[in-house]
Each structure stands twice: as C-alpha cells, then as structure tokens.
Amino acid sequence: MPARISRATYAQMFGPTVGDKVRLADTDLIIEVERDLTTYGEEVKFGGGKVIRDGMGQSQLSRAEGAMDTVITNALILDHSGIYKADIGLLDGRIALIGKAGNPDTQPGISIIIGPGTEIIAGEGKIVTAGGIDTHVHFISPQQVDEALNAGITCMVGGGTGPAHGTLATTCTPGPWHIARLIQSFDGLPMNIGVFGKGNASLPGALEEMVRAGACGLKLHEDWGCTPAAIDNCLSVADHFDVQVAIHTDTLNEGGFVEDTLNAFKGRTIHSFHTEGAGGGHAPDIIRVCQYPNVLPASTNPTRPYTVNTIAEHLDMLMVCHHLSPAIPEDIAFAESRIRKETIAAEDILHDMGAFSIISSDSQAMGRVGEMIIRCWQTADKMKKQRGSLPDDRPGNDNYRARRYIAKYTINPAIAHGMAHEIGSVEVGKRADLVLWNPAFFGVKPDMVLLGGWIATAPMGDANGSIPTPQPMHTRPMFGSFGKALTNTSITFVSQAAMDEGLREKIGVDKQLVAVVNTRGGIGKHSMILNNAMPQMEVDPETYEVRADGELLTCEPVDVVPMAQRYFLF
C-alpha cells in the first residue's frame, strides 16, 4: 500500500520534486522543478539503512555488464536545456546516462545500473550544473587555476606567458615556443584549458605557425595594433584552420572606427570581447556590434553588474593593466574614454534581453577569475529587481532567466570556441565536468567540483579530524588534482592542425589533446542559446545614450548586491 509524506519531508529526504521551488543563494531568483525522471517510491539513496545495499538498490552487475563508475543520486539539474530532477550515471569520465538509477533485478524502470563497482555521490538537495567556461583569461599566474576551479570553473581559454607586460594587457600567447611551454605547464594544472595565439599581423605566416603549434584560437588586441588589415588577415587564417578569433577593438579609433572594423569582418564569425567598451574597444559605440549575426558578443565581470562603485574602480585598474602613466595626459584621456556609465548601464539590460551572449572574467587584467559565476548571477538578480520577470518566465519562477544566464558561461562559450562536443552542458556523451552546489551557496562556493568524472576539489575539514567536517573547513584540492589522475581527467583544446602534426608527442605532454571544431561559418549569433537577440542599436556620440530598437537602455547602479560579503566573512 503506498505511503504518503509531506512535500517538506520528501524534499528533505530525496531533494525537491516537480512543483517545488528553490532560491538561488541569497538572490531573489527562484527556480522551479519542471520534471522528475526518478520514480516515487523507488528513489535510491546511500547510507545506513538506506536503499543502495546489496540485493536492494545495488545489483550484482559488473562494470562490463553495464554498471556505472559513479552515480549522482536525486540531483536537481540546472542547465540551459531545463531545470529537472534526475539520477546521473558517469562512466569513463563522461555523462553516460541521465534518468533513473538502481537495481534492474528488483526495481522497475531502471536505466542507470548501480553495481558493486559503483561509487555514489549524494545529490539530494543539491543543484548540479555543468562546469563554468571562462573564455577571457590572461594567463598571468598559475594560481588562477586554483581560484577558478574552487569557484566552479572547469575550462579556461585565453593566452599569456606569465606576468610579462604583454600578458598583463593582452590575452594571447605569442609564437610557437611560448605556446609549447604554456601547454607543457598544463600537465600540472587541474583544468581544461585552451590557448589563444597572437592574431595581430597583416600577413598569415606567423599566425599559421601558432595555430599549428597548438593555439585553439587567435586573439586580436588593440595594444598590438588592431587594424583592419590585421583583422582581415587573422580571420582568413582562422577560416582556413577552423579556429575562433576573439577581438578587443581599437578604443582610440586610430586604425578606423567601428564601421571600419565591421567592414573588415566581412560577415565572418568573431567573438567580441567586453562588447560594452569599458574593458576596451571603439569609444563610445563598440556596443553596437551586438546587433550583427556574425558577432558573438561577450562582456567581462569588472562591469557586472552596474553598481555605485563600478566607475570609481575602473580608472586605476585601466592604468595598471594597459601600462599607462598617470603623468601622461594622453594616457589619462585614453583610460577615461573607456569608462561610460551610460554604456555600462545598457550592458546590464542587453544581457537580460539576451543580446549579449557570453560572460567571462578578464582575469587579473581588470576582472576577477573567481567571481565570474557570482557576477553573472548578481546581474540576473539586479535585472529581476529592476525590470521584473521576463516575458518568457512563468508566474512564480525565474526558470527562463536562470537558463538564459547559465548559458552565458556554459554552453554558449563552448559553442563559440568549438568545444560544445565535449563540454558546456549536462548532457549524455559529454565530459563529466560537473559542479554540485548547496542552494544556499549556489554560484558562490561549490560543494564539489568534478573534472572528467573524478572529484578535483571540495570543501574539507581538518585532515586529522575524526570526521571530514571539523574546522577549519575550506575548499581543498582532492585526488583528482594530483599525479596522473590530473592528466587523465582534464584536457587541452588545440587546433586540428596541431593534432595532425602530432603535437602531443612532439612536446611530450601527458594530457589528452582535443581539437576544436565548427568555429567559423557554421555558427553565428543564432547559435547562442537563449542569448541570440539582435536589436537595432544606436549610440549617441555626445551623450553616450544607448538605444535598442529605439528604446533607451538605462538603469540605476545598485549599492547592495547578493552573493557578496555575507559569504566571505571567513
């Protein structure tokens, strides 16, 4: 005879189910469970006196007979594709199945087999997301990887050589020698990583050798001369090798105006960095490029969201990052031309409209690598408070908005850089790069981060304690961050040309190399999931006012944001 229990009791035991609502951290964002792939009365749970025991929820089947390596039980999945409850089966470091786990000999409707060789991660009451992807990383210090991983980032794409002045300002690794050294260093870093080569050249030869040396993309930056000739040449090389181009355009409009840059694109796909302009780009109207079908517009977290401190913070950051001198009036003018409250305010709204598609960090070069996810959700919360529910949201939840914002740092950067066949979503067949969150700490401090199906980092107490929880409790590297487990659970993204030339053997790295694919004409703004709006943009050159489809885009800065100081008292 079936038993009945209250929703509260059920949620406490097995996590929320259809119709239950969950608040994300201390924001005003509420998600609601849309569907539940588990079976009421047949839920699996690990523990003393619980279901996953021999002959009950655990079968006799071996790995060779279909049992999983790991099962995450009763997880609430938050993904661009939906918000739903399920068990997740992991095999060979990938997501093998999403559905109902258990013992097919004793339970009905089992698609995910638990056997004696299966580890269990308790997902009850936890939110599971795909690992974050940060596509704007200045590789200034290797310690960034620790900060990013501990914040829920599992893939970093960018360039640099360390604290060299070229790297402090620009996100690119110049030349095959530097690219080889950087890729070799990745064998010691628990992170999926891709490298941008320098894209600033008017002839193809030097760019071609960087792509063959392992660059998974090319970066055009104004500090190296972002002229129409360099843009055209870089995109031509990218088209030939199927790698993405990222661009930071000409703030001073020396080599041309935004129209000249757009003409140099010639309709070819390009990833536009900090499209708002405070991070750099044609002043004051680079923001206009988000209206074009070939531009994949992104912005970085220094301006996310617009607060009372945003403007004041930026001037000093710019002076340091771009090797400027406060004693030179022209340097001051350069910095001030990039900081416009009108376009920063519009940036908030364009993200909420889905006209800006990607959020990234700009790590240690104005942005904070460990705050990319936080800043994304702070923006979503600010926009809900100021603009109300989105038209596509149903009464009582913010599911559509949540899916739109999580897409900005998961699936969309993966699509933009040809990595979506491996990462970017909670999807069968993809790498098990997953993050578990306690809802109260969502987006701020993960409960666990998996790389390639293996735990890489997690909160942990005193290692000499009798249990795992005695203070000091803080995030620490786990076994997935050491030895050959590290090189067998994370990958390096490179070009197909580098794969064809045997780069792994040539430079002697242990990590698996994976080629990026479909970065050019096969994708465009239409490919940016839930973030493909292309409004007609106008920027007043005198007042800097921004309009989309004739509507003035403006909002007030906030003086309080969620996911902030209350989470970082210790």
Swiss-Prot record:
Cofactor(s) demanded: Ni cation
Residues bound to Ni(2+) 2: 219, 248, 274
Record-listed Ni(2+) 1 binding positions: 136, 138, 219, 362
Modification N6-carboxylysine occurs at: 219
Amino acids binding substrate: 221
The reaction(s) this protein catalyses: urea + 2 H2O + H(+) = hydrogencarbonate + 2 NH4(+)
Entry-linked InterPro entries: Amidohydro-rel, Metal-dep_hydrolase_composite, Metal_Hydrolase, Urease_alpha_N_dom, Urease_alpha_subunit, Urease_AS, Urease_asu, Urease_asu_c
Protein name: Urease subunit alpha 1
Gene source species: Brucella abortus (strain 2308)
Gene that produces this protein: ureC1
